[in-house]
């Protein structure tokens, strides 16, 4: 009797599957919990019976295609490295206890990336009509064989999988311009993309902060344009210069490595904006003729390409070498955030506009993009660009990547253009995954795992015909705040697991609870392969009414996690919690002082996140991290940043609002409070805000370097203290400020506001503590 599980249904649990008792050394790949697959297949049927994969199992290549041999070897190597099973690969007919791989023009799934996977008591068979489908079938089998972190044999239930992707474009963009990654690091990322069935690697290779691709006709692009001098260079761990580039041999290696995993590499050469590194190398291709340094400022810099014929020859020369290296049909030309000030100020550019009969600078950008698009068309390629390319008119066959929300995708699809959904902040991996104090550097607001999983690539505003233009969705790893690959991996995983299901699986099969129950197996795979994934979704949040605890000496403590999944266990004595610790069911009454530690465990007792801790004492409750303080009302551009932008370490991070250096200390009983102590930090102000610079609030200051001003309740409330900031040239980066506060009664919030000049360093709060009378600062 067959139990059928169509993954077009909302619930895809292998409930009720009956497996024979197994020896202790053999793991179950599917139990009554969930099938350990991400992304979820389009259709899965489970039957009675099982097949045991062990050291006696062989992988059989049943056709004569070299590509099938490569997939078989890939599967064998993956199983060996993650499961410890060394399965021989041979060519020929299937035998008992074998895994058969076969390219078959009559395979049941027609889609070129689709496959059929059948597990029977006699063996396993993967068939597909194309190499890509066979590869993805092998990836699915590998996931079935790695349901946990154990080594050795695995027993699979008999099953039939018929699978194919929902979308053709399943992408990840990596920014190698702001921070540089080695070829080996990129190869590790490509490995993970393949295991998540992602098939487009969008490689951001040029920007204001660095040119990363060798162009032999223009050697200054990498001799000068690939390197920048960081703020505070040579001090406090900041390098004297930062940069790097990929030789053409490096590029070929990455492209070949990706192709072997059925990933297309789409290069991005940004134009006409984000061009400061180009102009630093070849100022004649800029507008002003002046040579700027390669930028150290994150954001929107003013440098644009010129629009004369010499500059266009430079662009086409570069594209010729790019096309020779990248076989991708698509070439990404950027087109975003091109601030037109230099064009507006240039007499030559304005004369060019008049000669072309163009009404404005947006139309001039449209003219440039159209000219580049026609050049790419003539060479058998297709232009793709960010959604700003719509503003000045766009080539008829151009593809639009929508990043300013989904409006660009809607507009483009309604005009008949193919689109890729890549909206900020929804699919921007530099957005923080939680607002916990210990989260790494990145941008606010939070975009957690659940928000990525809930993203729908087809906007509801499109009709059925227009929806056919949606190629898929892509996540973007912008690396301003990711100086190391560890930062990138923390930002990308497991959010890419969520995206893979958005891009691959049928929309109707999406089920958050089911997805979270499949994540423990994926986390085990990450750990086995050394991936520094984020555990933010399962990290325990320890919450309480702070003021009630301060007043009564007893706290009502609530535990939760983002995922709403797993089992929470806790201790109250500071010891490490585990499955033998009390299980959380309802708020806890905890007498101060105490140390609450909590952890989320999976159904099998595995730890889904590292334990989190909160010390409950009067002193700790009166001490608040700057990362936990909200911004003051008004203009808001909130980041968490490291003190040094290019330091290659997981340094502490600090919350800043680029528009207004002001934060709110929460309302607190102020009776008996005598002193405020602030641990402060001085940061680099390396941000290019372009026209948004007018939003930066400048506060009057009474001393040369500004003050930290403490207001009662609101930022226009009574001044309780004003503490001068030290001379940045003669003080440490981290320093402490303190002041006596006037006597107050009742509960009050505090506004903590820096008045430092906006042309100098940026300041942040590490921690602010209130000290009662009689407590030494």
Residue ranges of predicted features:
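Feature activates predominantly on carbohydrate-active enzymes
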Residues: 108-312, 316, 321-330, 371, ...
């Amino acid at each position: 009797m067959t139990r059928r599980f169509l993954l077009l249904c909302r619930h895809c649990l292998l409930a009720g599957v009956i497996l024979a008792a197994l020896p202790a050394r053999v793991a179950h790949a599917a139990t009554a919990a969930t099938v350990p697959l991400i992304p979820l297949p389009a259709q899965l049927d489970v039957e009675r019976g099982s097949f045991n994969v062990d050291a006696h199992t062989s992988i059989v290549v049943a056709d004569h295609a070299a590509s099938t041999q490569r997939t078989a070897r890939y599967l064998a190597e993956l199983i060996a490295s993650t499961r410890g099973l060394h399965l021989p690969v041979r060519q020929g007919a299937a035998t008992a206890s074998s895994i058969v791989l076969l390219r078959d023009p009559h395979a049941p799934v027609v889609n070129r990336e689709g496959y059929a996977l059948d597990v029977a008591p006699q063996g396993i068979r993967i068939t597909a009509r194309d190499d890509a489908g066979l590869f993805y079938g092998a990836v699915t089998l590998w996931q079935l064989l790695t349901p946990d972190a154990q080594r050795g044999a695995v027993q699979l239930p008999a099953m039939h999988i018929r699978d194919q992707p929902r979308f053709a474009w399943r992408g990840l963009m990596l920014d190698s311009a702001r921070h540089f990654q080695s070829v080996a690091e990129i190869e590790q990322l490509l490995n993970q993309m393949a295991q998540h069935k992602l098939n487009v690697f969008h490689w951001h290779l040029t920007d204001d902060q660095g040119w990363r691709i060798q162009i032999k006709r223009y050697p200054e692009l990498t001799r000068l344009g690939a390197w920048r001098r960081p703020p505070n260079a040579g001090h406090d761990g900041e390098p004297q210069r930062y940069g790097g580039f990929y030789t053409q041999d490096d590029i070929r290696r990455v492209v070949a490595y990706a192709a072997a995993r059925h990933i297309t590499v789409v290069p991005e050469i940004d134009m006409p904006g984000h061009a400061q590194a180009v102009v630093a190398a070849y100022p004649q291709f800029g507008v002003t003729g002046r040579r700027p340094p390669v930028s150290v400022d994150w954001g929107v810099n003013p440098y644009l390409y010129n629009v004369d014929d010499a500059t266009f020859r430079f662009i086409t020369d570069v594209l010729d070498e790019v096309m020779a290296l990248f076989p991708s049909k698509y070439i990404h030309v950027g087109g975003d955030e091109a601030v037109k000030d230099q064009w507006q100020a240039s007499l030559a550019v304005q004369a060019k506009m008049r000669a072309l009969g163009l009404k404005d600078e947006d139309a001039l950008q449209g003219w440039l993009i159209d000219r580049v698009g026609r050049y790419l068309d003539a060479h058998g390629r297709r232009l793709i660009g960010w959604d700003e390319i719509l503003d000045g008119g766009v080539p008829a066959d151009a593809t639009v990547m929508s990043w300013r929300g989904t409006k660009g995708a809607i507009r483009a699809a309604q005009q008949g253009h193919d689109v890729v959904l890549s909206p900020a902040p929804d699919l921007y991996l530099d957005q923080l995954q939680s607002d916990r104090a210990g989260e790494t550097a990145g941008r606010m607001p939070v975009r957690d795992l659940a928000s990525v999983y809930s993203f729908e690539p087809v906007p509801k505003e499109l009709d059925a015909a227009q929806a056919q233009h949606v190629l898929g969705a892509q996540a973007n790893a912008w690396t301003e705040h990711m100086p190391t690959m560890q930062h990138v991996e923390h930002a990308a995983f497991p959010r890419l697991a969520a995206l893979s299901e958005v891009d691959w699986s049928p929309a109707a099969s999406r089920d958050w609870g089911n997805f979270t129950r499949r994540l423990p197996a994926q986390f085990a795979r990450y750990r086995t392969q050394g991936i520094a994934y984020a555990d933010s979704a399962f990290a325990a949040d320890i919450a309480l009414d702070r003021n009630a605890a301060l007043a009564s000496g007893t706290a009502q403590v609530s535990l939760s996690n983002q995922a709403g999944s797993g089992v929470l266990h806790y201790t109250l004595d500071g010891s490490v919690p585990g499955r033998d610790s009390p299980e959380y069911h309802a708020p806890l009454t905890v007498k101060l002082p105490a140390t609450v530690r909590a952890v989320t465990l999976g159904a099998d007792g595995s730890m889904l996140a590292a334990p989190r801790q909160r010390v409950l004492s009067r002193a700790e409750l009166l001490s608040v991290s700057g990362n936990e303080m909200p911004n003051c009302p008004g203009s808001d551009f909130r980041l968490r940043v490291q003190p040094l932008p290019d330091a290659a370490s997981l340094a502490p991070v600090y919350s800043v609002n680029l528009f207004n250096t002001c934060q709110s200390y929460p309302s607190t009983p102020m009776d008996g409070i005598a002193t405020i102590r602030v641990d402060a930090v001085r940061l680099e102000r390396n941000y290019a805000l372009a026209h948004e610079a007018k939003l930066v609030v400048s506060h009057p200051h009474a001393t040369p370097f500004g003050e930290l001003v403490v207001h009662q309740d609101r930022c226009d409330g009574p001044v309780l203290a004003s503490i001068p900031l030290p001379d940045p040239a003669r003080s440490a980066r981290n320093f402490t400020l303190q002041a006596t506060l006037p006597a107050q009664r009742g509960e009050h919030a505090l506004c903590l506001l820096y008045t430092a000049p906006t042309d100098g360093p940026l300041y942040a709060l590490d921690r602010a503590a209130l000290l009662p009378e009689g407590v030494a600062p």
